[in-house]
Amino acid sequence: MKNLFTILCIVLLVSCSSDNGSDIDTAPSGYPADLEGTIYYKWATDGILKVSLPSATGGSFIQDDTKLNSFDVSRDGKYRLTATNASTLGNYVVKFTLSNMNNGSIVKEFNYTSPAGNSYCKGQLSPDNSLILVTSNDEEDGITILKTDGEFVIRLEGLNNVPFSMHDLAMWLPGNELLLTHGNSIIRVPPPYNSGSLVKEMNYADWGDLTVNHQGTQLAVRIDNHVYTMGIDSNNMRQVTTSNFKESKPVYSPDSKYLMIGSNYRQSSVMGYSWDMKIIPNDGNTYNVDPVEANSPGVLPVIWKGQDRIVIGSGDVIWK
């Protein structure tokens, strides 16, 4: 196990229901031809759903998510990775399953027990499909990298002897590099994962929901109630959403031409939050995505083909 030690400085509007959306927005006459990929998202008790673009064809992806910790889809669209709670009395196991997207056959599968015995670990598949990034809400678990057959690679326990907290984030960059948050710091960590470089100190009272585009060139992050983008080196920060409410959950399209935004982000249950799915061009302009007022030209509410209600999400979301 290794401890990273070098830092190189260089509002409640709509309550949650079983419906797949709210009727605030109307479907556009058609989505742009260059709006590509599939958005996978959790919604209430309906499991993991998907909507493919530009056709806006919707459907189920994972029907039963009662024991599902996380899901991911490879960037080439060939594989699905799931992490499920497979624990039994006294045996706190997470099962990782890599399966074929075309026929559902299992490619690799293994059980994992974290140092803290946490059965709610999550996994992300590396860009080259060779590694799994394992995160946990227990600081004793740190951040772990495994091969897709379960072989241990490395565990990062913290930075400068300060462990990672449950609020810190970790994600892949191209070349199997890591992008991490540690407190208010955003950090890049290249293989072999024993040192890192500071991207930016986020000196804001409220920020989160950091994400990176597939190309590893741009970041999106929520600051206070709105979404901002910036270059991977933290330059050219721009506010890209506005409204009288809150936006969150930004996700880049595979080609980085668009951003999915969780607009009207609100608490919908004692422990849960939900949001309306809208898409904006990733051109550095600021778009009004308000749930009540008229939206800026170019804002696209996501509505399944044949339906008339905007898609609502309530958990993890990816665009592949």
PLM features: residue spans?
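C-terminal motif of bacterial Sec signal peptides marking the signal peptidase cleavage site
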Residues: L12-S15
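Sequence signature of WD/YWTD-type beta-propeller architectures
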Residues: D19-K320
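Sec-dependent signal peptide recognition
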Residues: K2-C9
